[in-house]
């Protein structure tokens, strides 16, 4: 089976900053890391992710971008459809639990630019259940995404590059890794 390169992205933040780490893997092997910072509860996550991917030496080799949700840095929403359009790399959001959209919408109402944030949530598309995880996709079908998710797993149900990105991001912010991706 051909080994694909995947980019997994996760964040960690405190009251001062939010770091976003990307981990590039091929098979079970870590090939490199990407890094950027975003505003907590801001609206710059999409632009920063696109820029991070575009400047990467791995860009042409990445088969798929994995995210653990459409939010980073609190409520800094990622427009996954735009990330796909501007990088030409499919995006798969992998979640352990289906989000409560009423609760999510209620929390977003407390932030500036509610209508823009709501639009980003809407264009992220339908949430699909695959086994014991939930996914959203940009640039590929749910069944294609399922194959890529399965190819990216080493242990558990979260793509390995997302898990590693989580560990690195939390170590940068907290001095050691914490929690689960």
Swiss-Prot record:
The lineage of its organism: Archaea, Methanobacteriati, Methanobacteriota, Archaeoglobi, Archaeoglobales. It comes from Archaeoglobus fulgidus (strain ATCC 49558 / DSM 4304 / JCM 9628 / NBRC 100126 / VC-16). It holds the Pfam family DUF99. Disulfide bonds: none annotated. HAMAP family: UPF0215. This is UPF0215 protein AF_1433. InterPro entries: Endo_dU. It comes from the Archaea. Belongs to the UPF0215 family.
């Amino acid at each position: 089976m051909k080994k694909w390169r995947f980019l997994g992205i996760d964040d960690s933040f405190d009251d001062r900053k939010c770091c976003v780490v990307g981990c590039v893997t091929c098979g079970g092997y870590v090939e490199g890391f990407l890094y950027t910072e975003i505003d907590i509860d801001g609206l710059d996550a999409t632009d920063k992710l696109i820029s991070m991917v575009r400047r990467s030496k791995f860009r042409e080799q990445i088969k798929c971008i994995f995210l653990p949700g459409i939010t980073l840095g609190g409520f800094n929403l990622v427009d996954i459809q735009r990330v796909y359009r501007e990088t030409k790399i499919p995006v798969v959001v992998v979640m352990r639990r289906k989000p409560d959209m009423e609760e999510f919408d209620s929390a977003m109402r407390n932030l500036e630019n509610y209508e823009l944030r709501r639009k980003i949530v809407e264009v992220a598309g339908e949430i699909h259940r695959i086994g014991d995880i939930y996914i959203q996709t940009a640039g590929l079908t749910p069944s294609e995404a399922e194959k890529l998710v399965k190819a990216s797993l080493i242990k558990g149900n979260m793509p390995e590059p997302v898990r590693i990105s989580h560990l690195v991001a939390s170590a940068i912010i907290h001095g050691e890794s914490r929690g689960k991706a």
